[in-house]
């Protein structure tokens, strides 16, 4: 709760938000960075992926994302772009986009945030239904002998 003295004085503390940085580099610098400089900041698995080259499919997705951002009205979210590319690595250019990531059954809408840089799209669209464990069945353990049968 607020202190009564502060409330009486009418002083409102301005909220400060943490400025995002990826490996010590702020977001504006990341957006202006060349691909070669950006790759140096990524972990080894992703550096290897970029060193082996981007194929046609990821480039087509980035092209569609650019188009959706351009066509979106100012201050609005861009239209969702659907994709099956779960192995696509999130780069700074994709921030602010909405992507429908296929999980094998449906397209889960994911809004790309700065904290997602360097992760795969698949990490944000779960492809399985987590197990909800029920009661143990007959023969599960010795103690289950005393559970009455239905």
Swiss-Prot record:
GO terms for molecular function: RNA binding; structural constituent of ribosome. It is found in: Cytoplasm. Gene3D superfamilies: 30s Ribosomal Protein S19, Chain A. One of its GO terms (biological process) is translation. One of its GO terms (cellular component) is cytosolic small ribosomal subunit. Keywords: Cytoplasm, Ribonucleoprotein, Ribosomal protein. InterPro entries: Ribosomal_uS19, Ribosomal_uS19_CS, Ribosomal_uS19_euk/arc, Ribosomal_uS19_SF. It comes from the Eukaryota. NCBIfam families: PRK04038.1, uS19_arch. Belongs to the universal ribosomal protein uS19 family. This is Small ribosomal subunit protein uS19y. It comes from Arabidopsis thaliana.
